[in-house]
């Protein structure tokens, strides 16, 4: 059995770790609430711009933008994979990478090539190890990402799609279900899913300047950018929720370890006291004898 002093040192060490994990849990909870607010604030824009695409498409049905046309044969798929820059968030990234790899393998089994634009240091490190082609990347997005950080890498895939280098673009990110649940999802970005008439709510008659086709070119790019940005913001909310839960679990585990060590410490101290008493009694008997 370890000595009482050694056990006391271990207890102090675990208590210090528990203080750190508890502080990280509180910080993550605060950041999660702010990330949720940003996530909710960006959704109306993404929904509205999709409605605008529907109106523009119906206003000029003869114009078929490349982003709206599904190609007969898919030879190469591009992925935008949104991960985190930091760890300590449970299995969030692992589950995300599994979803991405499963989808990617499904295409590869059909003889389709792939390239990946990872967002987040964890994703960059993972896909560099897989050997997949990485034409662009984004790291250090922070807790308050800016669209400007992502426009360049997004443009790389959009230009590749227009050039015919790739025939489909997917977005892989985590969906925030609730504080306890974050679900990885693979979403098709391009070609853009057709907008159903019921999604447009109203059939307004617009006046277009310069014309509907030119406006559609710009709006479709903005739509893809908004979807990626929404995915990044939502992924940050998922990251903070997962980190909060992971740190709470670590704090709870630390408390259990402290309880076990405290019992061990009490036993060691009791054994030491018993030993001292035995020695005192033995010494007294020797003197009296």
Swiss-Prot record:
Function noted in UniProt: Produces ATP from ADP in the presence of a proton gradient across the membrane. The gamma chain is believed to be important in regulating ATPase activity and the flow of protons through the CF(0) complex.
Entries under HAMAP family matching the protein: ATP_synth_gamma_bact
GO molecular function, one term: proton-transporting ATP synthase activity, rotational mechanism
Entry similarity comment: Belongs to the ATPase gamma chain family.
Name listed for the protein in its UniProt record: ATP synthase gamma chain
UniProt source species: Halorhodospira halophila (strain DSM 244 / SL1) (Ectothiorhodospira halophila (strain DSM 244 / SL1))
Gene Ontology CC: plasma membrane; proton-transporting ATP synthase complex
SUPFAM superfamilies, per the entry: ATP synthase (F1-ATPase), gamma subunit
Subcellular localization: Cell inner membrane
Quaternary structure note: F-type ATPases have 2 components, CF(1) - the catalytic core - and CF(0) - the membrane proton channel. CF(1) has five subunits: alpha(3), beta(3), gamma(1), delta(1), epsilon(1). CF(0) has three main subunits: a, b and c.
UniProt keyword list: ATP synthesis, Cell inner membrane, Cell membrane, CF(1), Hydrogen ion transport, Ion transport, Membrane, Transport
A matching Pfam family: ATP-synt
InterPro entries: ATP_synth_F1_ATPase_gsu, ATP_synth_F1_gsu, ATP_synth_F1_gsu_CS
Recorded topology in the membrane: Peripheral membrane protein
Main location: membrane
GO biological process: proton motive force-driven plasma membrane ATP synthesis
